[in-house]
C-alpha cells in the first residue's frame, strides 16, 4: 500500500494523542485505529505482545506502553498523526512531553471504572497545556461496564463539562453498537464482521428511544447556546441541521468549553470508526490552535509569533529523543512554522548551536517512511541532530526563535549502581548518557562519599525499566542497590548578616575574598527553588566577582548541611564584602560564596524534606479497617474515603519512604483483593525522630 504524502492542506491534518489510565485500553485503541486506517494488516494484540505501537522489548513483555511513538495514518482523506502516551504514573515525562506538541487528544476511559486516579492526573496535565479532548468510554463489553456511571465520574471527579454524543446499544456481553445522537441513528456491528470493519446504520431500538430523546435534548441545548442564530432557530422550534450541530460541537471542543463523549469496545472492534470520524469532525487542525509563541534567543521579553504556515520562517520543537537500532539517535520534532528540506542547516536556538537535518521520516510506530521536506503542522523523526535534546527549539538561522519548553519533575526515588567489571564501567557511562538524552526525568549523580553512581527516576517501575534497558541495549552488567528516597533539605527562617572571609597567604599570590550575606526561605512563582540577589554598592566587590559568589553558593547547595541532600527553596542576598587588589580572584570569591552559604544555612534552622505520595487504595469493605490502620502505621494521613462501584476507596498522603514493599503487604492483608495506585504529590518536612535517623545514617553515626 503506497503511503500518501504529507497533506499540504492543514485543515485536513490532526495531531492527536491518546491518553488514559494504565489499563483503560489506549494501545488497543491505537492498534484498531491503525488497522481501520489501513496501515496494519494484522491487528496487534497487547495480550500477545504484538502491538505495533509498543516497540521496545520491555513494553511487549509488560503489556504497557512506555515511550510515545508517533504514527501517521489516513482516514477519509484526512491525515492523523497519533502519539501514543503511556498511562503508568512513573512515565509522567512521556505524557507531559507529548501533550506539549499535540493539538487535541482522545481521553480513553475504562467503562467499568470510569475516572481512575491516573486518568485524573493526565487530565490535569492536559488542562495545563489547554489540549482540547474528546472522551472515549472503552471496554463497554466488560462485565460491570456502565456508560452512565463513567460519564458521572467525569463530571464529579474531573469537574468537566461533558456532552454525550453517543449512547451504548446493549452492554457487557450484549454490547452491539452505539446510538449516534447527532444523526439520531443506531450504528450496530454485525456478528459476522469479526474485525468490525463494517457496521449497519439502523433505526434507534424502541427501548432506547426515550433515553436517546432525553440526551439529544441536552446536546441540542448545549449546541444552541454557542451561537445567537442557532439559539433563535432552536427556540423557534426549527430542526437544526447535522452540519450546524457538528459545527457547534466542534466550536465547543476546540475552545475546551465542553468534551464530547463517545463509547465502544476497541478490543471487540466496535465503535472505533465513529470515534475516528469524531477526531476529524471535532478536534482542532494545526490552524485552529493559537499560533506558536516564543522569544528572541537571549531576550526573554521580546516576543515572537509564528503562524502554522509554510510561508513563515522555519521553527520546530524537539519533544523526544529515542535510540534506534540502525540510525542511532532519532529526534522527534513538531514543526510549528515554515518548511525545511532534509540536509538543510538549521540552528538549535535554545543552545545556540548549528545542526544539520540528516534524513527526515514520517514514522509509523517503528517503521519509517522517508520524506524530502518537513512542513508546518506536522510531526517528523529526524536523524543527524547532535546536540538537540528534549525541549530544544530548532529554527531558521536568519530568523531565530526559542519556543516555550516543557517542565519536568525532579526524581523522587534513587538507586545506586555498581558495574561488575572495568569494561562495564565504560558501557555504563555511555548507556547513562544515552538514556538521559531520551528521558529528562532520569537524573544521575556521583555519590561523593561512596563513589557510586546514583540514578534517580519517577518510581520503582521507571528505574526497573531503565536498568533493564542498560542490560539489554547496552549489555551493562551491574549490581543495583536498594531503592532510596530522594530527600532534600531546606531552611525555615531568615538569617541576616552572615560573613565569611577566605584568605590564604603562603608565598606567591595569595587568595582573598570577604562576603556578607543573608538567606531566607523562598519559592518562586514559576516553581523556582533558588534566587540570588546582589545589593552590593559602591564597588565594594567588583562586578565581575559577583557571579562567582552565586556559583559558589549553588555548589554548596548540591550537598546540604544536615545529611548531604540538595538544599532547595532559599534566596541568597549578597549585602557587602571586601576584596584585595592583588589577591582577589573569581576562585577566591567562589570559595567564599560556598563557605558562607554553609555557615548561614546551618544557622537558618535547616530541615529535611521528603517526597509525599498521593496514594489511593481500592478495597472491599471487609478490609477497610486493616487498610486504614496500615496506612496510619506508615505515617499516612487519610484525606478522604468514598464508595466506588461496591468497593471502598481510601485516599491518603503517605511518605514515599514508607511505601516500599507496600504491594506485597497490601496483598497479604486483603487476600489479594485490594489494589492501589500512587502519584507524587509534594515535598514535606520530615518529623524530628525520622530526621534524626536519616542524619545518623547519612553521617554514619
UniProtKB/Swiss-Prot annotation:
Superkingdom of the organism of origin: Bacteria
Record's keyword annotation contains Lipid metabolism: no
Predominant location category: cytoplasm
Molecular function in Gene Ontology: GTP binding; GTPase activity; translation elongation factor activity
Keyword list, A-Z: Cytoplasm, Elongation factor, GTP-binding, Nucleotide-binding, Protein biosynthesis
Domain tr-type G residues, every copy: 11-287
InterPro entries the record matches: EFG_II (IPR041095), EFG_III (IPR009022), EFG_III/V (IPR035647), EFG_IV (IPR047872), EFG_V (IPR035649), EFG_V-like (IPR000640), EFTu-like_2 (IPR004161), G_TR_CS (IPR031157)
Keyword Amino-acid biosynthesis carried by entry: no
Entry GO terms, CC: cytoplasm
Pfam families membership: EFG_C (PF00679), EFG_III (PF14492), EFG_IV (PF03764), GTP_EFTU (PF00009), GTP_EFTU_D2 (PF03144)
GO biological process, one term: ribosome disassembly
Location(s), subcellular: Cytoplasm
Binding-site residues, GTP: 20-27, 84-88, 138-141
PANTHER family for the chain: RIBOSOME-RELEASING FACTOR 2, MITOCHONDRIAL, TRANSLATION ELONGATION FACTOR G-RELATED
Functional description taken from the UniProt entry: Catalyzes the GTP-dependent ribosomal translocation step during translation elongation. During this step, the ribosome changes from the pre-translocational (PRE) to the post-translocational (POST) state as the newly formed A-site-bound peptidyl-tRNA and P-site-bound deacylated tRNA move to the P and E sites, respectively. Catalyzes the coordinated movement of the two tRNA molecules, the mRNA and conformational changes in the ribosome.
Similarity remark: Belongs to the TRAFAC class translation factor GTPase superfamily. Classic translation factor GTPase family. EF-G/EF-2 subfamily.
NCBIfam families: EF-G, PRK12740.1-5, small_GTP
Record's protein name: Elongation factor G
Organism: Mycobacterium ulcerans (strain Agy99)
Gene: fusA
Amino acid at each position: 500500500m503506497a503511503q500518501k504524502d504529507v497533506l499540504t492542506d492543514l485543515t485536513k491534518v490532526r495531531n492527536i494523542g491518546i491518553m488514559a489510565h494504565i489499563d483503560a485500553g489506549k494501545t488497543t485503541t491505537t492498534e484498531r485505529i491503525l488497522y481501520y486506517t489501513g496501515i496494519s494488516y494484522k491487528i496487534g494484540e497487547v495480550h500477545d505482545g504484538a502491538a505495533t505501537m509498543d516497540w521496545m522489548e520491555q513494553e511487549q513483555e509488560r503489556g504497557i506502553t512506555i515511550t510515545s511513538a508517533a504514527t501517521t495514518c489516513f482516514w477519509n482523506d484526512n491525515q492523523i498523526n497519533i502519539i501514543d502516551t503511556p498511562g503508568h504514573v512513573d512515565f509522567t515525562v512521556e505524557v507531559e512531553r507529548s501533550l506539549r506538541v499535540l493539538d487535541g487528544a482522545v481521553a480513553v476511559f475504562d467503562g467499568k471504572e470510569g475516572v481512575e486516579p491516573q486518568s485524573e492526573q493526565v487530565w490535569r496535565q492536559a488542562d495545563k497545556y489547554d489540549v482540547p479532548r474528546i472522551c472515549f468510554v472503552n471496554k463497554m463489553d466488560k462485565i460491570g461496564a456502565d456508560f452512565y456511571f463513567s460519564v458521572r465520574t467525569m463530571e464529579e471527579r474531573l469537574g468537566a463539562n461533558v456532552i454525550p454524543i453517543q449512547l451504548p446499544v446493549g452492554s457487557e456481553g450484549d454490547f452491539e453498537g452505539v446510538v449516534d445522537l447527532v444523526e439520531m441513528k443506531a450504528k450496530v456491528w454485525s456478528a459476522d464482521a469479526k474485525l468490525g470493519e463494517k457496521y449497519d446504520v439502523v433505526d434507534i431500538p424502541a427501548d432506547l428511544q426515550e433515553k436517546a430523546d432525553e440526551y439529544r435534548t441536552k446536546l441540542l441545548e448545549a449546541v444552541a447556546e454557542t451561537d445567537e442564530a442557532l439559539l433563535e432557530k432552536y427556540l423557534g422550534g426549527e430542526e437544526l441541521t447535522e452540519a450546524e450541530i457538528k459545527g457547534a460541537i466542534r466550536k465547543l471542543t476546540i475552545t475546551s468549553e465542553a468534551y464530547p463523549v463517545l463509547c465502544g469496545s476497541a478490543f471487540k472492534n466496535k465503535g472505533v470508526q465513529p470515534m475516528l470520524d469524531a477526531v476529524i469532525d471535532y478536534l482542532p487542525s494545526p490552524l485552529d490552535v493559537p499560533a506558536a509563541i516564543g522569544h528572541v534567543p537571549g531576550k526573554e521579553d521580546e516576543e515572537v509569533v509564528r503562524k502554522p504556515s509554510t510561508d513563515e520562517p522555519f521553527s520546530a520543537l524537539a519533544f523526544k529523543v529515542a535510540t534506534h537500532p540502525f540510525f542511532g539517535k532519532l529526534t522527534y520534532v513538531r514543526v510549528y512554522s515554515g518548511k525545511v528540506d532534509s540536509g538543510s542547516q538549521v540552528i538549535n536556538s535554545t543552545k545556540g548551536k548549528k545542526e544539520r537535518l540528516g534524513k527526515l521520516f514520517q514514522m509509523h510506530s517503528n517503521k519509517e517512511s522517508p520524506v524530502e521536506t518537513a512542513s508546518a503542522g506536522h510531526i517528523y523523526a529526524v536523524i543527524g541532530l547532535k546536540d538537540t535534546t528534549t525541549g530544544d527549539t530548532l529554527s531558521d538561522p536568519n530568523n531565530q526563535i526559542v519556543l516555550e519548553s516543557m517542565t519536568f519533575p525532579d526524581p523522587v526515588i534513587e538507586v545506586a549502581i555498581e558495574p561488575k567489571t572495568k569494561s562495564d564501567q565504560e558501557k555504563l557511562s555511555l548507556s547513562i548518557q544515552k538514556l538521559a538524552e531520551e528521558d529528562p526525568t532520569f537524573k544521575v549523580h556521583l555519590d561523593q562519599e561512596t563513589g557510586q553512581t546514583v540514578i534517580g527516576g519517577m518510581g520503582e517501575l521507571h528505574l526497573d525499566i531503565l536498568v533493564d534497558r542498560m542490560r539489554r541495549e547496552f549489555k551493562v552488567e551491574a549490581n543495583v542497590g536498594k531503592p532510596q528516597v530522594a530527600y532534600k533539605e531546606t531552611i525555615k527562617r531568615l538569617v541576616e548578616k552572615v560573613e565569611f572571609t577566605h584568605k590564604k597567604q603562603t608565598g606567591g599570590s595569595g587568595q582573598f575574598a570577604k562576603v556578607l550575606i543573608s538567606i531566607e526561605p523562598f519559592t518562586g512563582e514559576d516553581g523556582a527553588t533558588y534566587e540570588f540577589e546582589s545589593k552590593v554598592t559602591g564597588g565594594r566587590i567588583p562586578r565581575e566577582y559577583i557571579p562567582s559568589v552565586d556559583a559558589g553558593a549553588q555548589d554548596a547547595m548540591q550537598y546540604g548541611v544536615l545529611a548531604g541532600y540538595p538544599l532547595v527553596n532559599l534566596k541568597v542576598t549578597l549585602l557587602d564584602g571586601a576584596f584585595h587588589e592583588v589577591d582577589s580572584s573569581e576562585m577566591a570569591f567562589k570559595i567564599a560564596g560556598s563557605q558562607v552559604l554553609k555557615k548561614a544555612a546551618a544557622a537558618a534552622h535547616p530541615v529535611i524534606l521528603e517526597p509525599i505520595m498521593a496514594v489511593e487504595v481500592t478495597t472491599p469493605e471487609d478490609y477497610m479497617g486493616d487498610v486504614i490502620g496500615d496506612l496510619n502505621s506508615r505515617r499516612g494521613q487519610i484525606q478522604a474515603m468514598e464508595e466506588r462501584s461496591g468497593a471502598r476507596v481510601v485516599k491518603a498522603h503517605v511518605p514515599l519512604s514508607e511505601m516500599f514493599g507496600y504491594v506485597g503487604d497490601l496483598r497479604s492483608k486483603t487476600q489479594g483483593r485490594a489494589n492501589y495506585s500512587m502519584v507524587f504529590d509534594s515535598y514535606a518536612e520530615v518529623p524530628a525522630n525520622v530526621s534524626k535517623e536519616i542524619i545518623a545514617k547519612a553521617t554514619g553515626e
